[in-house]
């Protein structure tokens, strides 16, 4: 019972606190470079899993399957999912800048669509007709959620935000497909794979920040743009609470990853997907309670269709007359 509570609490905290951080950091408009800094924080949280990995190595002894024995080329190959994660996470943080926390989280439900498409085309898996029907409900639900956001005053630029999140899901689905491919031929603890990805992510994001700031962000044309990191850092110095929020998010990301991996191992990926639905609902409720957004019937309808599609896809519930 403790693991689901940890996963739900940390998962809700990640999104709500990130959106709250955006809202108190912005001045006349969102600080664009905040998206990259938040991505760096995500990878720092993933890299913190090394503490968990080292604990498991010590507690389980010589029988623990480590990545240390792998050839260098295999370790380098693990940078590929990290690169996909960088693209996906940064785009999603851009989306969170411009739309509400609940619409951001609901739009993330489109991930299952891209994962299914890649599973059939790249991993050569077969998806049944009823599962494709389930995905059509997911598509319809995401479309309604997106329309409810674009047709209301939710966020400063909801169309840009929703588009960024959707493109981000494509990159994350690519990441998940590569991870599944890696884990299919390498017997290794998934937590160590995430720790490696976090380390690669920190390295590549920092390298990208240095290069992009030098050539773009520090120029007159890049002033207060996507790569002007001095802008967001100066804002952090003006509002010290932003540092505290980043620290809490970093810790919650580490707890979310550890608890999620443990739940997948002890129960199933389906259980984890159920908790992710509960996470989405929790984010929506808390965002409304905090006055960050209001109730929209169309958004609720889209959310219901999204849940129905995901539940039927995982066979948690069945379509009427499906067995007849």
Swiss-Prot record:
GO MF, one annotated term: UDP-galactose transmembrane transporter activity
Pfam family, one: Nuc_sug_transp
InterPro entries linked to this entry: Nuc_sug_transpt, UCP036436
Protein's membrane topology: Multi-pass membrane protein
Keyword terms: Membrane, Transmembrane, Transmembrane helix
Keyword Nucleotidyltransferase set for record: no
Protein name from the UniProt record: Uncharacterized protein C12G12.12
Organism of derivation: Schizosaccharomyces pombe (strain 972 / ATCC 24843)
């Amino acid at each position: 019972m403790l693991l689901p509570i940890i996963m739900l609490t940390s998962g809700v905290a990640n999104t709500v606190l990130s959106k709250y951080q955006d809202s108190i950091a912005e001045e006349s408009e969102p600080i664009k470079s905040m998206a990259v800094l938040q991505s760096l924080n995500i990878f720092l949280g993933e890299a913190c899993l090394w503490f968990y990995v080292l604990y498991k190595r010590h507690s389980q002894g010589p029988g623990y399957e480590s990545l240390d024995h792998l050839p260098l080329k295999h370790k380098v190959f693990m940078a590929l999912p990290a690169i996909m994660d960088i693209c996906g996470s940064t785009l999603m943080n851009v989306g969170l800048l411009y739309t509400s926390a609940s619409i951001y989280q609901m739009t993330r439900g489109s991930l299952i669509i891209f994962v299914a498409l890649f599973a059939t085309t790249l991993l050569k898996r077969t998806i049944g007709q009823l599962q494709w029907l389930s995905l059509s409900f997911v598509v319809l639900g995401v479309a309604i959620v997106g329309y409810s956001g674009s047709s209301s005053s939710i966020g400063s630029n909801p169309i840009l935000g929703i588009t960024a999140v959707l493109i981000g899901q494509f990159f994350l689905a690519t990441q998940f497909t590569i991870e599944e491919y890696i884990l299919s031929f390498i017997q290794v603890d998934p937590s160590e794979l995430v720790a490696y990805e976090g380390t690669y992510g920190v390295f590549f994001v920092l390298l990208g920040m240095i290069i992009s700031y030098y050539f773009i962000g520090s120029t007159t044309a890049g002033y207060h743009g996507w790569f002007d990191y001095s802008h967001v850092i100066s804002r952090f110095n003006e509002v010290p609470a932003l540092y505290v929020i980043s620290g809490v998010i970093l810790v919650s990301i580490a707890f979310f990853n550890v608890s999620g991996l443990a739940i997948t191992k002890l129960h199933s990926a389906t259980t984890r997907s159920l908790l992710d639905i509960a996470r989405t609902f929790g984010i929506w409720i808390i965002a409304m309670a905090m006055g960050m957004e209001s109730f929209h019937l169309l958004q609720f309808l889209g959310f219901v269709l999204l849940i129905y599609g995901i539940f039927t896809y995982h066979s948690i519930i069945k379509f009427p007359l499906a067995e007849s």
